[in-house]
């Protein structure tokens, strides 16, 4: 530990103590808030089922930066490199297409055994796992419908895929001792004017009810459902809208997933958290960065990321909100993308934990909005960076931008050799 870092830390403790904040307690709380990293940043959402297949479902990964993972071994190695550079607790979020098998496996036939390597790896790296059925990039999703498909046989295929995915998710939770949050997102929708908007939603409702009919221990598995405003090729109508899934999660008491890029550009999910929490037992957050649309850019330490973190902390939602990331940028080093986005989410959580919320709440309750605004702005200048650097130091991870040197070395020695 450098003298400079120690000096900055001591000064920071004093500055925060002056506004009633115990920085040690803030760091202890930060150590209880895992962030679920998404595996698909590492290979541009290709997966191992059909790595050369096209990405469909109205989503896009743009760019062609060299060195993307081509198999599970490479993906896990890249993840390990990123994990070493991110302080504090982490989880890993898997999609069904990241299964491992020597023979082709139909999606409605996936089993826990196809993910046993991921479980053993998670145990070795002390990670929890989360899961997602993959309802896109498949011949039976090519016409834009899955769980709401008008063809009963195709619809049943996707129902069976989601049911099989829930068994995999429960296996994760049972093996790792921490519940797996399994999120259902489907691309179902229409490109142009839609006459019958009701029937697909009726089919989706019935399909979801069948999907979640098998009961699992909530200590092992948690169901979540995710809405979206539109996707490429589904600009005019999305079956799984916000209103649909808010109603579903409320009536069935599942978790609701809020994705930062799945709403109108003028909407923010930070404002939706407190409203949803009045009706649903849990929230899953997909923290992302939409640029004009659901572009899934790397998460920044920007106003919305900070607002999301602040909502969690201010309302003490630590046990009810699950924090996940969802971005995929193929134009930059993929390991660096993980590190940048995840460290930024954790920085936002730390800054929220260092806020004198009780004092601000009292000012708000008394109607002193002048002081509220003044203190909100002044606390941005408090030395939270020194607290962050101490946190990194205690977790044996680089401070500042020193982590980039490690990524560059890994790129030169490993990534550059991938064809």
From Swiss-Prot:
Keywords: Cytoplasm, Isomerase, Manganese, Metal-binding, Rhamnose metabolism
Classification via Pfam families: RhaA
EC number: 5.3.1.14
Cofactor needs: Mn(2+)
Main location, first listed in the record: cytoplasm
The protein's annotated pathway: Carbohydrate degradation; L-rhamnose degradation; glycerone phosphate from L-rhamnose: step 1/3
InterPro entries: L-rhamnose_isomerase, Rhamnose_isomerase, Xyl_isomerase-like_sf
Top-rank taxon, per record: Bacteria
GO molecular-function terms, A-Z: L-rhamnose isomerase activity; manganese ion binding
Free-text comment on the cofactor: Binds 1 Mn(2+) ion per subunit.
Compartment(s) of residence: Cytoplasm
Catalytic activity: L-rhamnopyranose = L-rhamnulose
GO CC annotation, single: cytoplasm
Enzyme class: isomerase
Keyword match Transcription regulation: no
Residue stretches spanning the membrane: none
Assembly: Homotetramer.
Name listed for the protein in its UniProt record: L-rhamnose isomerase
Organism: Salmonella agona (strain SL483)
């Amino acid at each position: 530990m450098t003298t400079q870092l120690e000096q900055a830390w001591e000064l920071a403790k004093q500055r925060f103590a002056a506004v009633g904040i115990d920085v040690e307690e803030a760091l202890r709380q930060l150590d209880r808030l895992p962030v679920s990293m998404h595996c698909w940043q590492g290979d541009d959402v290709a997966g191992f089922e059909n790595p050369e297949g096209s990405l469909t479902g109205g989503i896009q990964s743009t760019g062609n930066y060299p060195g993307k993972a081509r198999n599970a071994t490479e993906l896990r190695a890249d993840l390990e490199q990123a994990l070493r550079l991110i302080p504090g607790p982490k989880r890993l979020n898997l999609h069904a297409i990241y299964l491992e098998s020597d023979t082709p496996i139909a999606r409605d036939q996936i089993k826990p055994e196809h993910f046993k390597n991921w479980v053993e790896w998670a145990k070795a790296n002390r990670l929890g796992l989360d899961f997602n059925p993959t309802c896109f990039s498949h011949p039976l999703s090519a016409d834009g419908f899955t769980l709401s498909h008008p063809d009963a046989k195709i619809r049943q295929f996707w129902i069976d895929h989601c049911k099989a995915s829930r068994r995999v998710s429960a296996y994760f939770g049972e093996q790792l001792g921490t519940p797996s949050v399994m999120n259902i997102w489907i691309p179902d929708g229409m490109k142009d004017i839609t006459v019958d908007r009701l029937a697909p939603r009726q089919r989706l409702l019935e399909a979801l009810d069948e999907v979640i009919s098998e009961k699992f221990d909530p200590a092992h598995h948690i169901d979540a459902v995710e809405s979206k405003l539109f996707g490429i090729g589904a600009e005019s109508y999305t079956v799984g809208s916000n209103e649909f899934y808010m109603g579903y999660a409320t009536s069935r008491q599942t978790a609701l997933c809020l994705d930062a890029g799945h709403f109108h550009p003028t909407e923010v999910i930070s404002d939706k958290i407190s409203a949803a929490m009045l009706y649903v037992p849990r929230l899953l957050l997909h923290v992302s960065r939409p640029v004009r649309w659901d572009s899934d850019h790397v998460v920044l330490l920007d106003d919305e990321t900070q607002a999301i973190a602040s909502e969690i902390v201010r309302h003490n939602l630590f046990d009810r909100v699950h924090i996940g990331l969802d971005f995929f940028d193929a134009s930059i080093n993929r390991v660096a993308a993980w590190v940048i986005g995840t460290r930024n989410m954790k920085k936002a959580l730390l800054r929220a934990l260092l806020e004198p919320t009780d004092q601000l709440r009292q000012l708000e309750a008394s109607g002193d909005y002048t002081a509220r605004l003044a203190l909100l702005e002044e606390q941005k200048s408090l030395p939270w960076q020194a607290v962050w650097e101490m946190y990194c130091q205690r977790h044996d991870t680089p401070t500042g931008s020193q982590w980039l040197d490690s990524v560059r070395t890994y790129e030169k020695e490993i990534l550059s050799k991938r064809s």
